[in-house]
Amino acid sequence: NAKNGAFLELSEDMLKTYAPKTWESVPAEHWDLCKYNGEIYLMPEDNYAQWTNHGFAYRLDWAKEAGLTDGVKSWEDLTTYFKYVKETYGNDLKYLWDSDGTQYNQMVGGWITSHSNYVPIDGLNSGAMWGGSKDDLYTVYSPYMTDTDSLVEYAKLMKEWNEIGVFPTNVLNNTSSQNRDEYRVGQVAVEQHHTQTWTDLCSHTATNTIYDTDEDAETGFFYFGEETGNVVALSITHGAMAVSAGSK
């Protein structure tokens, strides 16, 4: 976008005038990462490292009831959780997971993260299809081409989840899911997103009425890659701010 002229060049004088605190707090090496052809185009998202592996927020109290005393720590644990919740609370819920047709991308990437040392090139590749490994970051490969046996196992697991009744039968065509809001009020058993969303869902806020209607309710989080310790911080340009070149 910067190359094609979509973003406004942010001069040092402009940043010092209109964003003085940001200018002072961002180190020079971070400004360098926000440059194209020597000009700054972005204000970085670098106030703190974001460890934002995606995963599932879930009812920790129900997981403990299912015998998972430490909560969900793997995809296998998650399957155990789903089976228990379906059998025990299925009639009280709208769905276990009111998923929609956009979730497949994060799901398969999460499976790969949990079952390999793959590290996607954040911010560059669509669908996290290309990256390196924790042992060899700079040799680029695609697990979609090399880890085919693992992906067959993932497909088998999704078939099992379908048979359990984890998601709606029209999941691939569903475009109107409000799963996160449904989790807040106790209508579903999980929400798939990342850790910053979990910090909201586990909080006793006015919108999270789940904790008012059930005093035992707790929300845990299983992040993709937890089994292997495969978690990385986001690039500081992931949520960086740019200004439209058409701004005046």
Name these PLM-found stretches.
Residues 1-248:
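Extracytoplasmic/secretory soluble proteins
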